From Swiss-Prot:
Belongs to the RNA methyltransferase RlmH family. PANTHER family: METHYLTRANSFERASE, RIBOSOMAL RNA LARGE SUBUNIT METHYLTRANSFERASE H. S-adenosyl-L-methionine binds at L73, G104, V123, S124, S125, L126, T127, L128. It comes from Burkholderia mallei (strain ATCC 23344). GO terms for cellular component: cytoplasm. Pfam families: SPOUT_MTase (PF02590). It catalyses: pseudouridine(1915) in 23S rRNA + S-adenosyl-L-methionine = N(3)-methylpseudouridine(1915) in 23S rRNA + S-adenosyl-L-homocysteine + H(+). It is an enzyme of class 2 (transferase). It is found in: Cytoplasm. This is Ribosomal RNA large subunit methyltransferase H. Keywords: Cytoplasm, Methyltransferase, rRNA processing, S-adenosyl-L-methionine, Transferase. NCBIfam families: PRK00103.1-4, tRNA_RlmH_YbeA.
Amino acid sequence: MKLHIVAVGHKMPGWIASGFDEYAKRMPPELRIELREVKPELRSGSRTADSVMAAEQQRIEAALPKNARVVALDERGRDWTTMQLAQALPAWQQDGRDVAFVIGGADGLAPALKSRAELLLRVSSLTLPHGMVRVLLAEQLYRAWSITQNHPYHRA
């Protein structure tokens, strides 16, 4: 099973790429993390947020792996603890499908895309830069895996 992070945005600062890469390389081969960047839609005064999200939705859907479990990151999503994520990983592995975590653009995700998701997940109640969410998610996936393996990285 692969873990995909499909994120609107490109040209992230070097520290974002370094942070993401650090946690991605720690993952075992059977849970490899792959980042798929989606070009953000250009915003102008005449464009509505809905039209921007609709255009980004098409790009996101084109980047989603076929038959993947879609987990949309959304501020109104469910609050999960790291332990809940750690409990979900083995179940998802047994299911056999890849998991795609979707990070929207500045306006969020289109309602139709959120409806398609099997899970809406909130990463934080804080407002975070979208690039930082990539790093945070990669770290939490690594931490969740480390919990399932009794690895010393997680000492809770």
